[in-house]
A protein has these predicted regions:
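Active-site phosphate-binding strand-loop segment of PLP-dependent enzymes
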Residues: 111, 123-177
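Conserved active-site segment immediately N-terminal to the catalytic lysine
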Residues: 170, 184-195, 204
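Active-site C-terminal subdomain of aminotransferase-like
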Residues: 194-267
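Conserved N-terminal alpha-helix of the aminotransferase class I/II PLP-enzyme fold
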Residues: 33-80, 87, 102, 110
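General beta-strand structural signal in soluble alpha/beta enzymes
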Residues: 7-9, 70-74, 97, 119-122, ...
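A glycine-/small-polar-enriched, mobile loop at the entrance of the PLP active site in fold-type I
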Residues: 4-55
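Conserved PLP-anchoring active-site segment centered on the Schiff-base-forming lysine
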Residues: 89-105
Length: 268
């Protein structure tokens, strides 16, 4: 393509040209099915292979063990702001939140709207979110700590994640997921709206430690339970097939063309 524009939008963000070319080549006839990826059944073998490959590549790239589920959930990261307290802050549970900008502020608001027990233990609002708080006094009895890894609007990022004294971190990584290796065992959940870094809008990658699924109250509506997606390989209802397929191709590019997250971090 002669005049491809450099795209610095925060989302939908740029995608690798080779991924777009592969999509173009296979768009009308996906894997010899005679149908487009936008037409095939999400119950088909072809799409089942897409999901399973995306899950496997996510696990390899991040070094995830079998105690993590990899899910594709709709609603972007913004819906997760609502789902996280709904799923993990049942009666008797509490969480610490760190406020570092627009997206963490929205996550805090969604928890507060539900009347959940949360504490904002640190904030950089006093200087217009121009820094990442240090020396945070986390509550040892908190069930999780919520962070936003990269604050696109304010331009700050956690270069190193804080010591939470063993409390699992739940982290919005929408704009820097797959950009660097992570100490994944420190996290209870990582989530990322695909359109920021790994695909088009429509899918949210959710990586969740399996034991957290046991925290979910029975009263949470079916489509707002992470356990619903885990039990059905992200296909309880019709998923955003095209978005998931594109994410799969980006993960393939990261693994096979770039050579993994160490290499990606070096490029970045």
């Amino acid at each position: 393509m002669a005049n491809r524009i450099y795209n610095f939008n925060p989302g939908p963000a740029a995608l690798p040209l080779s991924v777009l070319e592969e999509i173009k080549e296979n768009f009308l006839d996906f894997q010899g099915s005679g149908m487009s990826i936008t037409e095939i059944s999400h119950r088909s073998r072809q799409f089942d292979d897409v999901v399973n490959d995306a899950v496997a590549r996510t696990k390899r790239l991040l070094g995830l063990e079998d105690n993590f589920e990899v899910l594709f959930v709709q609603g972007g990261a913004s819906l997760q702001f609502c789902m996280i307290p709904m799923n993990f802050l049942g009666p008797g549970r509490s969480a610490d939140y760190v406020d570092t900008g627009t997206w963490s502020t929205k996550a805090i608001k969604e928890a507060e709207l539900q009347g959940k027990s949360i504490q904002v233990v640190a904030s950089s609002e006093d200087k217009n979110y121009s820094y990442i708080p240090k020396n945070i006094a986390f509550n040892e009895d908190a069930d999780f700590v919520h962070l936003t890894s990269n604050n696109t609007i304010k331009g700050t990022q956690w270069a190193e994640f804080p010591d939470t004294r063993g409390v699992p971190i739940i982290c919005d990584m929408s704009s820097d997921i797959m950009s660097r290796p992570l100490e994944v065992n420190r996290f209870g959940m990582m989530y990322a709206g695909a359109q920021k870094n790994i695909g088009p809008a429509g899918a949210c990658l959710v990586i969740i430690r399996k034991d957290l699924l046991d925290w979910i109250p029975d009263t949470v509506p079916t489509m707002l339970k992470y356990s619903t997606f885990a039990a059905k390989n992200s296909m309880y209802n019709t998923p955003p097939c095209f978005a998931v397929y594109t994410v799969q191709l980006v993960l393939k590019w990261l693994e096979e063309t770039i050579g993994g997250l160490e290499k990606m971090a070096g490029i970045n």
